[in-house]
């Protein structure tokens, strides 16, 4: 198939090209040309054409405000909520989603429905349920609660057996829970190592909700290589992360979208904390 009369951005030169034809073959770009070749054609009438976007920090099943989450919710309802959001993402141009904790493993169920041809949604790369310590950041959100290295190992293996592509853990607190701080680790080093060992045995990796430097350094020692948020990241830790080639998803919107948070019904303390953390968060990512 050829998509004709498209407008594309040349990311090398920064120039906008009009009247471009793009060949799609087996779901991939086969050729870009001023003149289409033989085959089916679909005119875009001068619309912009971009590759599918990838969202790497997604919670399709999340409930706003977080305090309204029902951990005993019927999984069918959870999947329907996730389905609607996945469709919204697809309409916005997002064709791949990495989920990093879903209530009732809604990501895995939705991905299975898509494979069966029952759901038109982006490609979903799921973590299933995240794993948290007792009293930790994931409590009340449908996470798996584990205490000690063996419990974390078993929890990770259970999520992997369910079909997860990666494992999500909360290694620090965050800004969503009243009275919670994020400057100290919530998981210990042995628990981190046990989780990484379980993931490595399945040829995959661990992604960590990680707000501050001490916990990130412990996680790096254990072999965790994907991090979310980094609200308070010092220069030495940022340098180490870069040198070791790990990945950071900064989620800057978490501390810079107060109007959206109020619209979604977040508690005022969450909005206030978000405002307070924003300058440090922005400075951390700039490092």
Summary of predicted features, one role per range:
Residues 47-118, 135-137, 190, 222:
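Metal-associated gating/positioning segment near the N- to mid-region
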Residues 135-190:
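Active-site gating/metal-coordination segments in enzymes
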Residues 81-107, 121-130, 164-177, 205, ...:
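Divalent metal-dependent hydrolysis catalytic cores, especially in the metallo-beta-lactamase
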Residues 39-48, 107-118, 149-164, 233-247, ...:
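Short amphipathic alpha-helices and their capping/turn segments at secondary-structure boundaries
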Residues 1-2, 8-50:
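Histidine-rich, glycine-flanked metal-binding segment
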Residues 67-80, 137-155, 205-207:
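Active-site mouth loops of central-metabolism enzymes
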Residues 5, 47, 57-61, 209, ...:
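Histidine-centered divalent metal-coordination motifs
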Residues 176-286:
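Active-site core of metal-dependent hydrolases
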